[in-house]
From Swiss-Prot:
InterPro entries from the UniProt entry: Glyco_trans_19
Record bears the keyword Cell cycle: no
HAMAP family: LpxB (MF_00392)
GO molecular function: lipid-A-disaccharide synthase activity; phospholipid binding
Top EC category: transferase
Keywords: Glycosyltransferase, Lipid A biosynthesis, Lipid biosynthesis, Lipid metabolism, Transferase
Encoding gene, per UniProt annotation: lpxB
The reaction(s) this protein catalyses: a lipid X + a UDP-2-N,3-O-bis[(3R)-3-hydroxyacyl]-alpha-D-glucosamine = a lipid A disaccharide + UDP + H(+)
Pathway of action: Bacterial outer membrane biogenesis; LPS lipid A biosynthesis
GO cellular component, one term: membrane
Protein name according to UniProt: Lipid-A-disaccharide synthase
Functional description taken from the UniProt entry: Condensation of UDP-2,3-diacylglucosamine and 2,3-diacylglucosamine-1-phosphate to form lipid A disaccharide, a precursor of lipid A, a phosphorylated glycolipid that anchors the lipopolysaccharide to the outer membrane of the cell.
Length: 386
């Protein structure tokens, strides 16, 4: 529907619960505003959405969790968010509800919206092709249009009777390098080294406590086994303070390693690295776009892992390998995540033929992701629903 046919000043509610969803949601809102400046926005999100003038009805950080078990401690916040957002849907119905990722919460909210006659656009759908496929029917009943971001998802949903459109991956709009390697190193006072290795344990407290100690032990082992200097780069997300890093091993290792904790220039940091060990998640696609050789790891609570094994029906857990349809990067899962194994794999990426092979595979994955412009395409889909 074009702007002339839409009611001027329509409100759109945008709901997301992850840091990555906040970024993708902000890019979508920005694209919507460029196409129709009269639109207003409310919803649940974080600082990126807030910076665009979105009325934040509930701070997404309060319900951001990792793993099945960890959800229980956040139930009061989840119910509070549900109550506030459902009340807003009823008392001031938006022209459109846009839900981003966060499937269990968002599908609950979508049910309320549909009951009120509010159209629902699901941008960045859950990975139902991997696990909990029973949600496919629920998604169809509670949404009107899907904007999918992985190449194979459009056909997957359409074969099951869903209105789905592939818009491309939004990371292609985000990932850009503004500083050269030399400029980045100079800016952050990082001295010369033979190799630079990235330690990316995730952006949540649970991930960091589960992975950072072993990342640091692996770094020490790697440095001890190599005759040349290695510098380690540790990006810190806005959701994490330095004290949490110190409590999870940094205090012990910061004097034993040449390690640099950096809170900005995220993509420049990644591009600077000769190899990276990263927690499974969106960051692996960012690294793939930058074509940085990586080792991907995942560890959760024993109960969450046990439940996940019963539900997940895929060969790989990293997005890079799932998109490629084969093993491009090595994956370490649960008890496989040890300092010894990490150091061995990183050494192979740095000094063996494996680094070249992984780089070639990542170029293929980068190409499979398509072209930039996901936010603009998603905005067109959203506006067609109002």
């Amino acid at each position: 529907m074009d702007k002339q046919k839409r009611e001027t000043g329509s409100e759109i509610m945008v709901v997301t619960g992850e840091a990555s969803g906040d970024i993708h949601g902000a890019n979508l809102v920005r694209a919507l505003k460029e196409k129709d400046s009269s639109l207003s926005f409310s919803g649940m999100g974080g600082p990126e959405l807030a910076s665009l003038g979105v009325e934040i009805l509930y701070d997404a950080k309060k319900i951001s969790v990792v793993g099945l078990v960890e959800v229980f401690s956040h139930l009061p916040s989840i119910f509070a968010a549900k109550k506030i957002l459902q009340r807003r849907l009823k008392n001031k119905p938006p022209a459109l509800l846009i839900i981003i990722d966060l499937p269990d919460f968002n599908l609950m909210l979508a049910k309320k919206a549909k009951a009120l006659g509010i159209p629902v656009f699901y941008y960045i759908t859950p990975q139902v092709w991997a696990w909990r496929s029973g949600r496919i029917k629920t998604i169809g009943e509670r949404t009107d249009q899907l904007g999918v971001i992985l190449p194979f998802e459009e056909e997957f949903f359409r074969q099951r009777g869903q209105a789905a459109s592939y818009v491309g991956h939004p990371l292609l709009d985000n990932v850009s390098i503004k500083l050269s390697r030399e400029e980045f190193l100079t800016k952050h006072r990082i001295g010369p080294a033979a190799k630079y290795v990235g330690l990316l344990p995730g952006s949540r407290e649970k991930e960091i406590s589960a992975l950072l100690p072993d990342f640091l032990r692996a770094a020490k082992r790697l440095q001890d086994e190599c005759s040349e200097k290695i510098s380690f780069l540790l990006p810190i997300a806005a959701t994490i303070d330095r004290e949490q890093l110190l409590e999870n091993g940094l205090a012990e290792y910061q004097d034993l390693l040449d390690i640099h904790v950096i809170s900005e220039d995220r993509y420049e940091l990644m591009a600077c690295c000769d190899a990276v060990v990263a927690a499974s998640g969106t960051v692996t696609l960012e690294l793939a776009i930058l074509e940085v050789p990586m080792l991907v790891v995942y560890r959760t609570s024993p109960i969450s892992y046990w439940v996940g094994r019963k539900l997940v029906k895929i060969e790989f857990f990293s997005l890079v390998n799932l998109i490629a349809g084969r093993e491009v990067v090595t994956e370490l899962l649960q008890d496989e995540v040890t300092p010894e194994r990490i150091s061995i794999e990183i050494k192979e990426l740095l000094y063996g033929a494996k680094g070249v092979a992984v780089g070639k595979g990542l170029r293929e994955v980068h190409g499979l992701l398509g072209e930039a412009g996901a936010s603009a395409k998603a905005a067109d889909l959203a506006l067609s629903m109002i």
